[in-house]
Amino acid sequence: LDQINLTLEKGDFVTVIGSNGAGKSTLMNMISGVLSPDVGKIQIENKDVTRLPEFKRSKFIGRVFQDPMAGTAPSMTIEENLAMAFSRNKSRALRKGVDKNRKEFFKESLKTLHLNLENRLNAKVGLLSGGERQALSLLMATFTQPSILLLDEHTAALDPSRARLITDLTKELVEKDQLTTIMVTHNMQQALDLGNRLIMMDKGQIILEVKEEEKKKLTIDLLMKEFQKIRGETMLSDKTLLSID
């Protein structure tokens, strides 16, 4: 990353685009604590977390990865995964399993996914489809209303119908809880459709930032022209990396 200066207001939903090697994943890993910056600092809700290890930083952060197999424990049941996510920010883990009220809360939460998972609490997560696991991962990441939600190409590995389902669910959950969110995507149309801010990265830098009303007027064609104007080169060479569907 090179001279990154990014400030998010509470409730901002920022979509991030850029071809492979632009620095998108590095940005996410810096925020989450997987990587540490050589210079500069990272603050979450005015708290300096720059040297805070990833496992401690996770109390502030929810993250969903591209791989549906990540983010859940496949050998555990849906209920056990939800209990684990629910207790993430608690001072002590659940000791006596899940009580009746907690189970009912889990069921009501799962109903919002519209996948009938509320009737499969005892099913092993490893038996779920990719779309079901990604929906569960998204729910788990937002359970405790994190200070910031990181979505790292979380629909890229799904078929089109499941990707649309997860996209719609993302919008619903983020809007419902007004979650401050950063979403990396290769799908330019998705980047335009979601969020109130958009940033474009290239070679480790933020080369374009668009906010609010200006973002609503953007089209894929305008984005590509803006890149060419800034960098003096075309994005067409990246058409296999940046989906326009």
Predicted regions and their residues:
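Helix-to-loop junction immediately C-terminal to a conserved catalytic motif
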Residues: S32
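Conserved ABC transporter NBD signature motif
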Residues: G40-D48, L208-V210
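Q-loop/switch helix immediately C-terminal to the Walker
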Residues: M76-K90
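ABC ATPase C-loop
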Residues: A141-T142
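H-loop/switch region of ABC-family ATPase nucleotide-binding domains
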Residues: T185-H186
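Conserved beta-strand-loop-alpha-helix hinge in the C-terminal portion
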Residues: Q205-R231
